[in-house]
């Protein structure tokens, strides 16, 4: 028996389904919207990314790595920075003058963090642990390669080691290094952390590697080896000091061993018990050289020259996937892209496409009268162009749905109980489609007075009317029957 209480039930898997006919799990894609801001300042440039959107008591903040590559020489033109933009509505962003670090002798910029060396990634999160000290409310993680001093090596004989460094800040602008975290990994991607109020612990999702045969000892590999595969691992901690052994995420039996870059895993705040991730999928297409002659960004031999100079950075392509989980370790993942590469132009089908910003934000709809939606962001352009951070939207809970075509389908749940007095559904039908809901006893027999009739429309919160009061069934074991035609059901909730 499954107790739904008064929690939102997402139709993102078939965990509560006992029987179904004509139903599939449909993945939806976000809508492309406006450019939120352009990284076109002298201290920004064509190679900006590894970004994070946060809504905190201090407002809406957008952190990103800012750097620029001269693609005539394939060299960085300045040391990478961590920059911060701000917004009041999540649609348009401004760059505040933080006046912390100088670029070309001027501090009139939005640089929030600067190193005297190259850095790969720096991810910020706001710590919602109520016991967190005030000067640590903002935390940041940096994956760094630490090299041994000249003529020396580390205990294992290596000339360098990869570590995850922890920084703290009271205001999210002035960061102070604290320590290395006791976590083993490679960390050469966007490593993220957060406090999980449901399990009362910290999660860190980070980059590591394995080999295709899974025979290498952990951390004993060369990432350049063609057998190496980029993966995502997770570790947890109650105190941000002592960490569990990292575990590789699993995606079910027979799941393709895709190479995954940034993971973008977070709690889905609208529904208890769910994690959602939007990892970037990486594929080196060096084995298809003739195709590059016809692919975009090759009209002036730019890609050919990049392949010759940097190898995989010119021959690899990337897109964004979707994965969901109930425990943060075992994920259901589609093999189709969540954010695909669009029609070819001079700024896409490149290594670095579809690296979505970590986090999402509830924003007002663009059309009057429509309900709020979820905004996400992704950098685009780059290479010979300043990076543009574009906004994308999706309806609330709209990542996946139970779907039936016009021919129809049915779902009968396992025995469940609920705690609310009313039922609301997030659904969409065609003009001829419908959804019918019946409440049944544990044997599947429809209960008198608890049939909705045909429901049609497109609403994230449609009330469902029954002939009798739901209060009479509160806490009682029953089943729910859904009958579909040309319909998507995204979620439902007893309130």
What are the residue ranges of the model-derived segments?
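Carbohydrate-active catalytic/glycan-binding domains of CAZyme proteins
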Residues: 1-495
């Amino acid at each position: 028996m499954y107790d739904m209480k008064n929690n939102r039930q997402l139709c993102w898997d078939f965990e509560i389904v006992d029987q179904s006919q004509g139903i599939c799990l449909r993945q939806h894609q976000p809508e492309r919207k406006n450019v939120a801001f352009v990284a076109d300042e002298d201290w920004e440039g064509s190679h900006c990314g590894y970004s994070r959107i946060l809504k905190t008591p201090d407002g809406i903040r957008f952190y990103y790595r800012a750097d620029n590559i001269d693609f005539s020489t394939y060299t960085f033109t300045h040391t990478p920075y961590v920059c911060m933009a701000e917004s009041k509505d999540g649609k348009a962003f401004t760059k505040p003058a933080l006046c912390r670090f100088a670029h070309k002798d001027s501090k009139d910029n939005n640089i929030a963090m600067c190193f005297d060396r190259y850095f790969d990634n720096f991810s910020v999160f706001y710590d919602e642990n109520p016991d967190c000290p005030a000067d640590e409310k903002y935390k940041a993680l940096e994956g760094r390669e630490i090299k041994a001093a000249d003529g020396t090596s580390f205990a294992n004989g290596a000339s360098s080691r990869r570590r995850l460094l922890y920084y703290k800040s009271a205001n999210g602008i002035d960061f102070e290094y604290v320590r290395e975290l006791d976590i083993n990994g490679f960390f050469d991607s966007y490593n993220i952390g957060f406090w999980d109020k449901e399990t009362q612990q910290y999660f860190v999702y980070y980059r590591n590697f394995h080999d295709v045969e899974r025979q290498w000892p952990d951390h004993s590999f060369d990432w350049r080896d063609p057998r190496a595969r980029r993966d995502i691992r997770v570790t947890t901690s109650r105190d941000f000091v002592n960490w569990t052994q990292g575990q590789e995420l699993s995606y079910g039996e027979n799941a393709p061993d895709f190479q995954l870059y940034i993971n973008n895993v977070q709690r889905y705040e609208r529904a208890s018990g769910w994690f959602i991730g939007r990892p970037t999928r990486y594929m080196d297409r060096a084995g298809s050289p003739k195709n590059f002659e016809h692919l975009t960004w090759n009209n002036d031999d730019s890609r050919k020259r990049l392949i010759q100079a940097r190898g995989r950075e010119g021959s690899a392509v990337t897109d964004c996937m979707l994965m969901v989980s109930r425990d943060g370790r075992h994920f259901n993942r589609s093999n189709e892209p969540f954010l695909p590469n669009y029609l070819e132009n001079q700024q896409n089908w490149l290594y670095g496409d579809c690296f979505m910003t970590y986090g999402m934000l509830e924003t007002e709809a663009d059309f009057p009268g429509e309900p709020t939606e979820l905004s996400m962001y992704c950098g685009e352009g780059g290479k010979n162009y300043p990076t543009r951070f574009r906004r994308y939207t999706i309806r609330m809970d709209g990542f996946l749905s139970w779907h039936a075509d016009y021919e129809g389908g049915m779902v009968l749940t396992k025995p469940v109980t609920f705690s609310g007095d009313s039922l609301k559904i997030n659904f969409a039908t065609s003009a001829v489609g419908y959804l019918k809901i019946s409440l049944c006893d544990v044997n599947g027999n429809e209960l008198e007075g608890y049939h909705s009739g045909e429901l049609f429309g497109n609403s994230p919160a449609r009330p469902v009317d029954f002939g009798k009061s739901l209060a009479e069934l509160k806490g009682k074991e029953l089943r729910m029957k859904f009958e579909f035609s040309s319909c998507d059901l995204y979620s439902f909730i007893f309130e």
